[in-house]
From Swiss-Prot:
Keywords: 4Fe-4S, Iron, Iron-sulfur, Isoprene biosynthesis, Metal-binding, Oxidoreductase. GO terms for biological process: isopentenyl diphosphate biosynthetic process, methylerythritol 4-phosphate pathway; terpenoid biosynthetic process. The gene is ispG. Pfam families: GcpE. This is 4-hydroxy-3-methylbut-2-en-1-yl diphosphate synthase (flavodoxin). One of its GO terms (molecular function) is iron ion binding. Pathway: Isoprenoid biosynthesis; isopentenyl diphosphate biosynthesis via DXP pathway; isopentenyl diphosphate from 1-deoxy-D-xylulose 5-phosphate: step 5/6. Its EC number is 1.17.7.3. Its cofactor is [4Fe-4S] cluster. Signal peptide: none annotated. It comes from Treponema pallidum (strain Nichols).
Amino acid sequence: MDSSAGVSPCNSPYGSGLLDVPLKLRPRASHYRARSLVIGGKEHVRALPLGGDAPIPIQTMWKEPLIGADLQSIVDRLLELEQLGCDVVRFAVPDRESAELFVALCARTRMPLVADIHFDYRLALRCMDGPVAKVRINPGNIGVRERVRAVVEKARATGTALRIGVNTGSLPGVVKRAVAARYADGMQSVNARAEALVQTAFAEAAYLDQLHFDRVVLSLKASTVAETVRANELFAQQSDIPLHLGVTEAGPLVSGIVKSTLAFSQLLSRNIGATVRVSLSDSMEHEVLAAREILAECGKRAGGVRLVSCPRCGRIGFDVHAFVRRWQKELFSLKKDITVAVMGCVVNGPGEGKHADLGISGAEDSVIFFKRGKIVRRIQVRDLCADERTRIIDAAFKEELSSL
């Protein structure tokens, strides 16, 4: 037996009183639109709108433990991430000492921060003593409902948003068994696993609804594109709760970006998704830049530098790869709405790069700079050593860039 019908939150497999009150659904229109929510805004922390017509914020997660870290170094790094386009950063808070450090960190940055809590609900309570923007909990491992209620009441009192994170790896057994019984192949199909995610999410959302708490973001994550897309589609068809998009355990740089791009592009094209994180076994900077580019290509984020560059071939007259590595971070930190082209030879530049506001290209024994297809500077590099060549090229590029 297979099931292709929509998921009903009123028929949750949780049972045993865990879903006593059905979720008051606010059905979406066919174009989908999440309800509006503002996170942050407490004390000195920047207020960040999401859902509704708000731009889609980019999130990353801090990659190291807080214990033993220098807080000022973290604050400085957060500023760098913000300049690249990051809007929110989530921190793992696994113990009391980390919670104390997290509260201290919140007091020192304008960046909206999220506390990621598992197992011990008291850590969530402590984190909300500071100007935290949002607390992420997984009710599946927080414990009894009274603990979730305590978190909700503290969030209400402090004006803190909550994100309920539901992952395929931590679905309640009762949900999996109930859903598996309705499918011929049990939990093996994409639809079954997606439905289990949605049923779990609805059960948690219904409990928060029962407590009259609506400062909520939900995430339904799987490690495959198909399950992630299907689960978020099913949920979005029946609720306007803002959704945080992500593919969990997406993998290293290349495969992780591919998975996130495929999932996000399908969902964002339907206006599903209020915030995003590209989860990578790589740097936070790459997570932010990948999310930024995905949103831009999906028409969901405007402004900033658009960097185009050729892949490089045997005609190379200019080291494209090295130049991009040197300049990428600075270019993406600029607030200018421009296109920059970095080309290896005259085949691509300035011809194929003529649309760029500023371009640089190799040309036999020289490097040329062009603006909107017109050559504005040429530098002879044949007799220059590598270091001198780099210095002169970078200085000229910086001068041309500053003139835009």
